[in-house]
Design a protein with these regions (language model features):
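Short aromatic-cysteine micro-motif
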Residues: 128-130, 157-339
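C-terminal, surface-exposed recognition/capping segments
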Residues: 64, 269-302, 344-353, 376-478
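Short hydrophobic/aromatic-rich beta-strand motifs
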Residues: 29-41, 336-338
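Short, intrinsically disordered N-terminal pre-domain segments
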Residues: 1-28, 473, 477-478
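Extended, Lys/Arg-enriched charged tracts that mediate electrostatic binding to polyanionic substrates
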Residues: 95-158
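Intrinsically disordered, low-structural-confidence terminal and linker regions
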Residues: 58-79
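Short, surface-exposed terminal/edge motifs of secreted or surface/virion proteins that either
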Residues: 36-57
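A short, polar/charged loop-to-alpha-helix boundary motif
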Residues: 354-368
Length: 478
């Protein structure tokens, strides 16, 4: 050992001998806000952290994901906040399916078998025991922010310190990927039934008993705004795919799965951190010759129930008139939510795209409970502007949960991976958002997919709106 090495060893020994146990240290007298502690960071290195911030973070757990926007990948660059909370987020929020009464009280279904309740007693999905809903069972806060080239999305059960948060009350969305109509009582439902009372599509009885039957399907070809009218007949807190509910699906998928590509292949195994990875597969998006079915629903509401509260995909075989296979439709499932994208477009209510001569400005309603007039932007809050050209989505805004594209220029395998349709060059006026895309939209489809071509007075064979509810008014303020 050299003399220099001996000197350094003796210095280390002296420092060690001069060290004190915690019980021997003097009591601190400074401000907590000025104190710092050593922490072990996620990269395994020791780092310094403000003590006050550390205590606040530990007491008010936050979890999320971030993307490095200096590159185009749809996969998250890493996670933010508590890894343990992120692992347990689906359980923490109570994600899964419930039967919900009109007063919004609900019972949890067995996570592996939706034909019974969590306590093992039989459950019926035909409406006699409540509406079959996919729920987040507690409210939570959401924030998005950017640091340099890193874009963060995070959730917490408490306001996230230093961030502009929005509160999302507990609520739910039809588990079926569209709305079912009670044709007898003219009320929007979420039930699984082959009865004529709940016939889907445009209620065409002449299709009963044929390969194009609409029994057991979601309702379509109704004026967009009427879905809300029929949903609100259930009472306060009900509507049809209110924009906040649509945003919940998008946000939670990004955070839990760490990808913006919902059509990424299913990976059953979790990653090395115990987190979900991959996607939900192609979905019902590659239907050939859909025109032969008139662009009406082809997958019944019963498809996908067998996965319970799981994530992944199952298959429903669409048959030709002669009984032979026409299309093996993939049904994506997100913790029990069927068709978060694909099959049938979903109307998004409470949001308006005001397409003018020079700008396309997006507005949201500040309150669900206060009612909503889709013929006017009076009293609404401007949240963003959308592009004036169609293309794959590069950027989206989640300001006040609008979940709208703000920039195009991506591809089916970069950034948000989904397509944005608009027609401002040929049509002006107030437009609604359609989300998810349809059964023949291929890689253009996904929960982030957005169409703004149509007004609330439109009706289409391939468009529906799922029932939704909130325990409290999802109030937004600028």
């Amino acid at each position: 050992m050299t003399s220099d090495q001996e000197t350094r060893v003796l210095a280390m020994l002296s420092a060690f001998e001069a060290g004190k146990k915690i019980s021997e240290l003097d009591t601190a007298s400074g401000s907590v806000s000025d104190m710092r502690i050593e922490v072990l960071d996620t990269d395994g290195e020791s780092k310094v952290m403000n003590l006050s911030e550390a205590v606040t973070t530990a007491a008010n757990a936050v979890c999320g994901r971030y993307w490095n926007e200096s590159n185009s990948t749809y996969r998250a660059a890493g996670y933010h906040g508590s890894l343990d909370m992120l692992r347990k987020l689906p359980e923490l929020l109570g994600l899964g399916c419930y039967l919900v009464q009109d007063d919004r009280t609900r019972r949890k279904l067995d996570p592996t078998n939706h034909y019974r309740f969590e306590d093992g007693t039989p459950a019926k999905l035909d409406g006699t025991m409540g509406q079959y809903m996919w729920c987040w069972n507690i409210g939570f806060y959401f924030a998005e922010w950017k640091v340099g080239n890193l874009k963060y999305y995070a959730v917490s059960l408490s306001p996230i310190k230093g961030k502009q948060c929005v509160y999302i009350p507990a609520g739910g969305l039809s588990a079926l990927g569209g709305g079912v109509m009670d044709r007898t009582n003219n009320i929007l439902c979420s039930v699984v039934s082959d009865a004529a009372q709940y016939r889907g599509g445009n209620n065409d009885a002449s299709r009963d008993g044929t390969y194009r039957t609409q029994l057991g399907m979601v309702a379509t070809n109704m004026q967009y705004r009427n879905f809300s009218t029929y949903a609100r007949k259930r009472g306060e807190g009900w509507d049809a795919n209110w924009y906040v509910a649509q945003a919940v699906v998008e946000i939670l998928f990004m955070i839990i799965f760490g990808t913006r590509n919902m059509q990424e292949a299913v990976i059953a195994e979790k990653d090395s951190n115990g987190l979900y990875q991959g996607g939900l597969g192609a979905g019902t998006t590659n239907m050939p010759n859909w025109d032969q079915w008139g662009y009406y629903p082809v997958v019944p509401t019963s498809a996908g129930i067998e996965l319970g509260d799981g994530c992944g995909e199952t298959t429903f075989n669409v048959l030709k008139e002669d009984g032979s296979l026409h299309y093996a439709a993939k049904v994506p499932v997100f913790f029990g939510l069927k068709h978060p994208f694909g099959h049938i477009w979903k109307i998004v209510r409470g949001l308006i795209d005001n397409v003018g001569d020079e700008k396309s400005e997006v507005y949201v309603a500040p309150s669900l409970y206060a009612g909503y007039d889709d013929n006017s932007i009076s009293g609404l809050i401007k949240v963003c502007e959308v592009p004036r050209t169609s293309g794959y989505i590069k950027q989206k805004s989640y300001y006040l949960l609008c979940a709208m594209p703000t920039e195009i220029g991506a591809t089916a395998s970069t950034y948000f991976c989904d397509y944005f349709w608009e027609n401002s060059a040929s049509s002006k006026g107030l437009r609604v958002r359609l989300s998810g895309a349809g059964a023949n939209d291929g890689t253009d489809a996904g929960a982030f997919a957005t169409g703004t071509n149509n007004a609330a007075s439109n009706s289409n064979a391939n468009v529906s709106a799922p029932l939704c509810f909130f325990d409290a008014d999802p109030v937004m303020s600028a």
